[in-house]
Amino acid sequence: MYLKISRNAKGRASLSICEKYRDPITRKPKDRIIRSLGFADTYDHLYDDPIAHFRDVVKQMNEEQKHVSSLSVLIDMDEALVPDSSDLKNVGYGFIKRIYKALEIDKFWKGVAKKEKTNIDLEKIFSLLVFMRIIRPGSKKDTYEHRDMLFESFEDIKLDDVYRALDYYTKYDAEFQVWLYDHSAPLYKRNIRTTYFDCTNYYYDISKPDIDELDEDGNVLKKRYRKYGPEKNHRKDPIIEMGLLIDADAIPLSYGLFPGNESEKVNMLPIIKKAKSRFGLERTIVVADRGLNTSDNIFYLNGNNKKENNPRDGYVYGQSIRGADKEFKKWCIDPEGYQNDKITDGCDTIIFRHKSRIYPKTIHVNVDKDTDHPKKKEITVDQKQMVYYSQKYAEKQALERQRAIQRAEDLIRHPKKYDKVSAKGASGYVKNIAFNKETGEVIDLNLKLDVEKIEEESKYDGYYSIVTSELNMSDIEIRKIYKGLSRIEETFRITKSELDTRPIHVTTNEHIESHFTTCFAAITLLRLLEISLGNKYPAPQIIESLRQFNCVNISSNIYRMTYTNEILKQCGALHDIDTGKKHRTKEEIRRILKY
């Protein structure tokens, strides 16, 4: 530490105690203020030479810091535990908080509170919800009840204020998404030339879906989110759908929510359109799986693609082979035109067997969609179609089908064992199958194995197709870009398994939206920390490390740290913090947490 002297235009000297540190983003040395002392002349009545006095103070502080390791602590061996309390405090969230502060998220919500003229501490509640979503995910009530597990005090927060704050978070969600992007872009060099889109759903532990608000004529005034739909794990609970857009480095860009009974196919373009408008994005190549590869999602994103340098957004979509037309199927399995290239796939070198063509694809686009008489229009678009073959993928598909066939044969022999849900996957290989509409039970009507379908499917084992608007993109680049979709699937897994985004405990549309605002902030901050660590550690390991970085108070001002590992060591290295140090003063921990 040192005494910093700054003089204004009139020559008055202001004093502050500062220390050197290394910026975690730029890695350049910087200074930070430990304590502001004000103008030197305000101390003239106390000291003959205020500057000399405070230089001595700083010198003494440095000496005390050197000798803090030799402090003796008196322990009362008869001291009793306080019932229903824990001395264990988490400090790991501090590394998330540092990014939170770097993005000035605190400034955003303080600005909202000032604008709304509310006495609710929107920023403090938001930070609590975000940090606890990573450290100890749970309902809003559960988060409130366990808020004392964080080192900082959140005791002045009231549970009613937590729920009242949610109404503000949904109101400013769109602005907040823009704020996150604008403040992260210069620090992390956001790559939005390629973006990835996918949808998932989250379930509720409720017995009935929501009912939309209708007017007197039966027109929908307000759609409710919680509806029955195809839940990813085949649960029968009501769900909500979320579409997520991430950048090329898997950092979330934007998201949208829609009712669980709506198709993800029709919600992709509106979410992308909103994101582009909000962020002022220029041309981007949208990558999505084959479930989102529709005529509308081709044409309304890219047009007919006839221009040599099409200024419209591009796409890279997965393409179903088994569900394609006869000409495309025949082209895929025709051995003519295939070439073999050695490529690096992770740590392995593999043979990439592939071929491609530029093809005038005929699609049927919905026009006049917002009228009472929508219709289809036939359009031809230029598209690059690439197909590749993988023996490993062929073996995987054959094995999965064989397992389904075994269940189909068992279903044929014992139809009463199955219903519509339990027969899923196997029923596709059974002829004449039908289900009771009320009970879902299998109706026994001369069930037979569909041998023809099995033979037809097996022709295409190992083949995978990807289509794109980028006519000059190489086959290897197409495959590489498409493989990036795994990062958005991984993001969904993190939100569900690590951040416990589901089941959702709030009920109104506004509170549901706010729940996702805090979850979106949490996963974004987590991804930025992952990038800061050089993408060397998977997110679940980072989360677990942050959760384990705790301390216990052993005297009024001394704490014992309880855990460290290599990930925490690297987190500390970003900020010149030794996470291997066993004992810390309260002031040292406060510096980690920047408060």
Q: For each predicted feature, which ranges?
A:
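Anion-binding and metal-coordination hotspots
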Residues: 3-9, 13-15, 24-26, 103-595
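Conserved glycine(s) in the ABC-transporter nucleotide-binding domain "signature"
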Residues: 1-123
